[in-house]
């Protein structure tokens, strides 16, 4: 099982047509220019958006680890979060959110199916990116197989930072690879 940290609907830059993009957690790279650093870690990560915080201290009060304090700069994490999710579940303004959730296959497919008509009419489909989706080849292949059974166009957006065997296994289950070339070194390439 792998975690998905975001689902972006009506995406137009992640493959042909209008798409639903699934963002998987975990990436072995640490690119300083990464657009999705919340996808680095394979585990859930608590995210804080200061401008959404109203200073109600609900998160401080419900945290069983006593990990959060309210300061003049907003909520401060003391560094011993267990990612239990109690603070994120109780935050009334979503200033605290958990990036990363396990999805049962039927629930994930139900989310994707919501946009079927738009995807079909636009020639779109589903794109899986990350993080680096090839870190979770078995789970990725399960998702791709299920999408294929349902007739969705399947795209994987990847750095290809994986073994040739993993790349081949995934390539057999999707119609398109989008490859992010992260760095070119003429001495190595």
Regions found by a protein language model. Name each.
Residues 1:
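Iron-sulfur (Fe-S) cluster-binding modules
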Residues 5-58, 74-83:
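N-terminal pre-triad scaffold of radical SAM enzymes
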Residues 22, 31, 132, 156, ...:
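Conserved, mostly hydrophobic/aromatic
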Residues 42-173:
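Conserved Radical SAM active-site core
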Residues 43, 185-189:
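A short acidic, helix-capping loop that chelates divalent metal ions and anchors anionic groups
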Residues 171-185:
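Non-cysteine beta-strand/loop elements that form the S-adenosyl-L-methionine
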């Amino acid at each position: 099982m792998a975690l998905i940290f975001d689902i972006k609907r009506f995406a137009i830059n992640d493959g042909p047509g209008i798409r639903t993009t699934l963002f998987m957690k975990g990436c072995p790279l640490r690119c300083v220019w990464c657009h999705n650093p919340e996808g680095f870690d394979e585990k859930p990560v608590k995210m804080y958006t200061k401008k959404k915080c109203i200073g109600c201290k609900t998160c401080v009060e419900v945290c069983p680890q006593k990990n959060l304090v309210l300061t003049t700069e907003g909520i401060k994490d003391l560094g011993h979060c267990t990612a239990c999710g109690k603070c994120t579940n109780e935050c009334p303004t979503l200033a605290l959110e958990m990036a990363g959730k396990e999805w049962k296959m039927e629930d994930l497919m139900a989310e994707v199916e919501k946009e079927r008509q738009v995807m079909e009419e636009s020639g779109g489909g589903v794109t899986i990116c990350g993080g680096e989706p090839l870190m979770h080849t078995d789970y990725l292949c399960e998702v791709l197989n299920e999408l294929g059974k349902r007739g969705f166009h399947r795209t994987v957006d990847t750095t290809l930072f994986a073994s040739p065997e993993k790349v081949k296994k995934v390539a057999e289950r999707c119609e398109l690879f989008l490859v992010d070339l992260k760095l070119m070194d003429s001495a190595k390439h």
